[in-house]
A protein has these predicted regions:
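Glycine-rich phosphate/diphosphate-binding loop of Rossmann-like nucleotide-binding domains
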Residues: 123-165
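Short glycine-rich or small-residue beta-strand-to-loop segments that form or flank ligand, phosphate
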Residues: 56-59, 83-84, 125-131, 180-182, ...
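Glycine-rich phosphate-binding loop
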Residues: 169-207
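Short glycine/serine/threonine-rich phosphate/pyrophosphate-binding segments
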Residues: 67-69, 135-140, 164-165, 184-194, ...
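Glycine-rich oxoanion-binding loops at beta->alpha junctions
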Residues: 111-113, 152-173, 218-219, 235
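C-terminal binding/interaction regions
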Residues: 130, 134, 171-175, 179, ...
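Long amphipathic alpha-helical segments
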Residues: 1-89, 94, 99
Length: 253
């Protein structure tokens, strides 16, 4: 389906005289004539998502069978869109690869990706900072998602508050970012520290990493929601994808 980038490129070609208005009209009509969604019986694949939101529909692998994931993925790719499956199992990837042979599985982040169409590049850099090594799967979900959405990403991992010197050594990279995603479990203190050092938006991602009283990330979530530093927003527990989506929108403004 047509993306915002495709439409911008087409209009630019018309403005430069490289494509006539009649040909542009034919191309656009052909794109819009296609069904806005495809009913697979168990899912309705939204082919106009990229027009409304700038990026195609993303598949959440949780709760879907491998065959369902593969069928949705095949339909998305068939219409020329970029593929992103989050929380994907190895079994789901095997099923997807049977119909989308170019797909890639990112085991650390449990993502399936296949870039098929261009997206507008972000204006700056998104920095992904994570507190501990155990937080990296969520951080990688955010990093890979942001990259697929057209952003330049820098990773700063294992800089938790138990060793602040590790974080302070990265102040220049943090300050140069356009938006920062901070991933942390335990007590969730890292986003407040980072936000106190920079003048850019900080998106906090609590993770489910921690011992008993962390309550599966609830302690980190509440700590981040009660941050004393300004400029911090918070997404749901382990939601690296959601953080990356917001960061990408900010970076494309």
């Amino acid at each position: 389906m047509a993306s915002n980038k495709w439409l911008e490129d087409l209009l630019a070609q018309v403005a430069r005289g490289e494509v006539s208005a009649d040909i542009a009209h034919e191309q656009l009509t052909e794109k819009l004539r296609a069904r806005p969604f495809e009913d697979l019986g168990f899912a309705r694949v939204d082919h106009h998502r990229s027009i409304r939101q700038g990026f195609p529909e993303v598949i959440l692998g949780l709760g879907k069978t491998p065959d369902q994931v593969a069928a949705i993925a095949e339909e998305i790719v068939r219409r020329g869109s970029t593929l992103l499956v989050t929380r994907a199992s190895v079994a789901a990837f095997d099923a997807v690869r049977a119909v989308v042979t170019q797909a890639t599985y990112h085991q650390a982040a449990s993502l399936i990706t296949f870039r098929q169409s261009d997206v507008a590049p972000g204006k700056g850099t998104i920095v992904i900072a994570s507190a501990g090594t155990s937080d990296q799967p969520v951080a990688e979900e955010a990093a890979l998602t942001a990259e697929l959405m057209g952003n330049t990403v820098e990773r700063i991992y294992d800089v938790g508050v138990a060793g602040l010197h590790r974080l302070l050594g990265e102040r220049q990279r943090l300050a140069a970012a356009r938006v920062i995603i901070v991933v942390a479990g335990m007590e969730g203190a890292l986003p407040s520290v980072v936000a106190g050092l920079v003048a850019v938006p900080v998106i906090a991602v609590p993770t489910s990493i921690g011992y008993g009283a962390s309550f599966g990330g609830l302690a980190a979530l509440l700590g981040m929601l009660n941050s004393c530093a300004s400029g911090v927003s918070v997404v749901n527990i382990d939601n690296g994808f959601g953080a990356a989506n917001i960061a990408s929108l900010i970076n494309h403004l």
